[in-house]
Amino acid sequence: MKSRAAVAFAPGKPLEIVEIDVAPPKKGEVLIKVTHTGVCHTDAFTLSGDDPEGVFPVVLGHEGAGVVVEVGEGVTSVKPGDHVIPLYTAECGECEFCRSGKTNLCVAVRETQGKGLMPDGTTRFSYNGQPLYHYMGCSTFSEYTVVAEVSLAKINPEANHEHVCLLGCGVTTGIGAVHNTAKVQPGDSVAVFGLGAIGLAVVQGARQAKAGRIIAIDTNPKKFDLARRFGATDCINPNDYDKPIKDVLLDINKWGIDHTFECIGNVNVMRAALESAHRGWGQSVIIGVAVAGQEISTRPFQLVTGRVWKGSAFGGVKGRSQLPGMVEDAMKGDIDLEPFVTHTMSLDEINDAFDLMHEGKSIRTVIRY
């Protein structure tokens, strides 16, 4: 079938809006009509050429919502007409990782997904007879996309796709990191480095967890009003100080902050976040994705004296079994999604959405098909 899509033909180049061909779903696959998709920093990271798994030409996009059109052989968990969110972190329920109960990382389709292919090692997209790669198992920058059944969360059909599409990545990543990875407790102190969608979601998650002090940190003070709306008690611009941000935080509590979250992908900030964590028990959660090849470092003394470095992917959330509940929470108002959507655009305007993001003028732009 034909589908309008925003295709990245080469790294560092604007996306091109073209009509592509989408093949029917094969065994274990599902064809969906995407209704809305967010434009995320991860898409920009891959488009820049810095992503070691980046392959071109590719249909990007991984933060979407849509409706099932057709299912392939053997698919039982969804049917045509069901409303779904594609998942870049699958949940097969059968691999060693899923069975462990210790992680949300599933390896069922990871190897082929990292190569831009469907589980059988081929692609369902083509343009002028030439194959196009998939992206993170989702490719939501196409009006129609094919996704593995294990990479789809079935959601309430009454949910507002313009908002809940954000649960496909950024908001779930931030809120989940608070509850699942850090396990923030009432009264704990929290510092959030970087106030993009993920960082703001961490702030909201910290408020849900009844954290005592929630410190929001960013060099763009225009983000502070929204941070306060989500629950920040303090907002700090590091540029306002003539000393390292670590020292600013240690002035707040000389022993450090209970939980720090790095939501940028900057290895220097990762170190600062760790060294701002509370002596004896503080933990720092790395959420931001650094450029390939970069390494993190600190003095071993920082760890010997009780600080812990952790990482978090998709907030530790199991997509198929847990994400539908988060959609319900959003519908009840327990998760506030509307403020994240600062702009809505058509697919034809998608390059403008990337520009807004790079200029720091948007939190999330949602593309409506």
From Swiss-Prot:
<feature type="binding site">
    <location>
        <position position="98"/>
    </location>
    <ligand>
        <name>Zn(2+) 2</name>
    </ligand>
</feature>
<comment type="subunit">
    <text>Homodimer.</text>
</comment>
<dbReference type="Pfam" id="PF00107">
    <property type="entry name" value="ADH_zinc_N"/>
</dbReference>
<comment type="function">
    <text>Has high formaldehyde dehydrogenase activity in the presence of glutathione and catalyzes the oxidation of normal alcohols in a reaction that is not GSH-dependent. In addition, hemithiolacetals other than those formed from GSH, including omega-thiol fatty acids, also are substrates. Also acts as a S-nitroso-glutathione reductase by catalyzing the NADH-dependent reduction of S-nitrosoglutathione.</text>
</comment>
<dbReference type="GO" id="GO:0106321">
    <property type="term" value="F:S-(hydroxymethyl)glutathione dehydrogenase (NADP+) activity"/>
</dbReference>
<dbReference type="GO" id="GO:0005829">
    <property type="term" value="C:cytosol"/>
</dbReference>
<dbReference type="GO" id="GO:0046294">
    <property type="term" value="P:formaldehyde catabolic process"/>
</dbReference>
<dbReference type="GO" id="GO:0008270">
    <property type="term" value="F:zinc ion binding"/>
</dbReference>
<comment type="similarity">
    <text>Belongs to the zinc-containing alcohol dehydrogenase family. Class-III subfamily.</text>
</comment>
<feature type="binding site">
    <location>
        <position position="106"/>
    </location>
    <ligand>
        <name>Zn(2+) 2</name>
    </ligand>
</feature>
<dbReference type="InterPro" id="IPR013154">
    <property type="entry name" value="ADH-like_N"/>
</dbReference>
<dbReference type="InterPro" id="IPR011032">
    <property type="entry name" value="GroES-like_sf"/>
</dbReference>
<dbReference type="GO" id="GO:0106322">
    <property type="term" value="F:S-(hydroxymethyl)glutathione dehydrogenase (NAD+) activity"/>
</dbReference>
<feature type="binding site">
    <location>
        <position position="95"/>
    </location>
    <ligand>
        <name>Zn(2+) 2</name>
    </ligand>
</feature>
<keyword id="KW-0560">Oxidoreductase</keyword>
<dbReference type="GO" id="GO:0004022">
    <property type="term" value="F:alcohol dehydrogenase (NAD+) activity"/>
</dbReference>
<dbReference type="InterPro" id="IPR013149">
    <property type="entry name" value="ADH-like_C"/>
</dbReference>
<keyword id="KW-0479">Metal-binding</keyword>
<dbReference type="Pfam" id="PF08240">
    <property type="entry name" value="ADH_N"/>
</dbReference>
<dbReference type="GO" id="GO:0042802">
    <property type="term" value="F:identical protein binding"/>
</dbReference>
<protein>
    <recommendedName>
        <fullName>S-(hydroxymethyl)glutathione dehydrogenase</fullName>
        <ecNumber>1.1.1.284</ecNumber>
        <ecNumber>1.1.1.1</ecNumber>
        <ecNumber>1.1.1.-</ecNumber>
    </recommendedName>
</protein>
<keyword id="KW-0862">Zinc</keyword>
<feature type="binding site">
    <location>
        <position position="169"/>
    </location>
    <ligand>
        <name>Zn(2+) 1</name>
    </ligand>
</feature>
<feature type="binding site">
    <location>
        <position position="40"/>
    </location>
    <ligand>
        <name>Zn(2+) 1</name>
    </ligand>
</feature>
<dbReference type="InterPro" id="IPR002328">
    <property type="entry name" value="ADH_Zn_CS"/>
</dbReference>
<dbReference type="InterPro" id="IPR036291">
    <property type="entry name" value="NAD(P)-bd_dom_sf"/>
</dbReference>
<dbReference type="InterPro" id="IPR014183">
    <property type="entry name" value="ADH_3"/>
</dbReference>
<dbReference type="GO" id="GO:0005737">
    <property type="term" value="C:cytoplasm"/>
</dbReference>
<keyword id="KW-0963">Cytoplasm</keyword>
<keyword id="KW-0520">NAD</keyword>
<feature type="binding site">
    <location>
        <position position="62"/>
    </location>
    <ligand>
        <name>Zn(2+) 1</name>
    </ligand>
</feature>
<dbReference type="InterPro" id="IPR020843">
    <property type="entry name" value="PKS_ER"/>
</dbReference>
<feature type="binding site">
    <location>
        <position position="92"/>
    </location>
    <ligand>
        <name>Zn(2+) 2</name>
    </ligand>
</feature>
<dbReference type="GO" id="GO:0080007">
    <property type="term" value="F:S-nitrosoglutathione reductase (NADH) activity"/>
</dbReference>
<dbReference type="GO" id="GO:0051903">
    <property type="term" value="F:S-(hydroxymethyl)glutathione dehydrogenase [NAD(P)+] activity"/>
</dbReference>
